[in-house]
C-alpha cells in the first residue's frame, strides 16, 4: 500500500508552496495512522480466525467472509473511538449467535401469524430491545447510526437476516407492550388518542435522546437556552401522543413512576432523566 504522499509529490507541494512542511508532515502522519489502524483491524480478525482453527472449530469460509464484509461496513459508519465502544462491532460469536436465535424466533412468530399484541410477541420484542440497548452500549447515537447503516447498506439484510419486515414487527410489538400498560392508567378517550398517534413520530425519539445524552456529557445546564430548547423538543414529542391535558399528562407520569417496563428499550438513563426533570 502507498504510505501517503510520495517524496516527489511532497517536493512538488513544497516547490509550489501549496502546503507548508509541518502541514505536509501532519497529513503524512494522519495517512499512516489510518493505514496502521486498517492493518491492525485486519490483524485482529486474522487472529480470531487462527484461534478458531487452532481450537478445532473450523469456521465456514463463506460465513467468515461475510463477517469481514460486515466489519468493513462498520468501519465506514463509525470512528475508531466509536468502534472500540460499540459491542456490535466486536468479534463475538456468542453475541452473533444470540442475535441469530432472536431473529429466528421473530421469523417463527411472523410465519405463524402471531399478532404483535400477543404476550409472546411483546415478550420477544422486549428481549430484542433490551439486547439492542445493551449491544449499543446504551448510547442512542449508536442506535441512530445503526439504523441509518441498515437502511443504506443492502448487505446488512443479507449478513444479519434482519429484514425491514422484522424491524417493523418488533417495533410494533414493543409499542404494544407499552400501550398495554398505559391502557391501565388512561380512560377510553385518552387511550384512543394515544394509540392513534403513538406511531406518528416514533422514529424521532432516538436522535432526540442522543442529544439529551450529549447535553449531559457536555455539562449543558438544564436552564440554559440550549437545555430549554431540548426540553421543549422532548415535551412536544411526548405530547404528540399523550395530548396536552394536565390530568392526562399526570396519568402518564404516574405510569412512568410505577411501571419499570416503560423505561426498557428507551436508552434513558437515570442521569439523563434527572437532567430532563431539571430543565
Label the model's feature ranges.
Residues 2-279:
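Amphipathic alpha-helical "stalk" segments
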